[in-house]
Amino acid sequence: MKVVGLTKKIMEHLKEPITIKELAKKLNMHPKNLDVKIRVLRDLGLVETKKGRNGGVRLTKEGLYLLEKGEITLGSLKLQIVAKDRIGLLADITSRISKIGGNITSTVLEREGDEVIIYLVVENVDKDEIKNTLEDVVEKISILW
């Protein structure tokens, strides 16, 4: 998924909360036309809307991630991770993956002595970014597919 054209312009203005009316004025668009685009972004989970006096629209964490990256792959990576077993290891790994916008769809953990082998299927992450994110926590990380 790439962020280009009008979608990119809209998302660039949504780093901070803003009303549809204010955003439409900035983009020189009719608010009703903009509202249609905002609803699509909301349905994709890229923006959140809030009604009322202090309402408006702004990017979600996922929307900010997509805008920053400019493109995400909707494919999955299967990872094999080897690490020294310790309390909180899996929580540490999964929270780091979550912080870079990854979504874990499958987890299998095997223990061999004082080491664990963890197999993860992860969506929405770049293979180099995930390796950099986990390098100080694990002994070895392999991309299986």
UniProtKB/Swiss-Prot annotation:
Domain ACT positions: 78-145
One Gene Ontology term, aspect cellular component: cytosol
GO MF entry, a single one: DNA-binding transcription factor activity
InterPro entries: ACT-like_dom_sf, ACT_dom, TR_Rrf2-type_CS, Tscrpt_reg_Rrf2, WH-like_DNA-bd_sf, WH_DNA-bd_sf
Gene3D superfamilies: 3.30.70.260, Winged helix-like DNA-binding domain superfamily/Winged helix DNA-binding domain (1.10.10.10)
GO biological process: regulation of DNA-templated transcription
Domain of life: Archaea
Stated name of the protein: Uncharacterized protein MJ0241
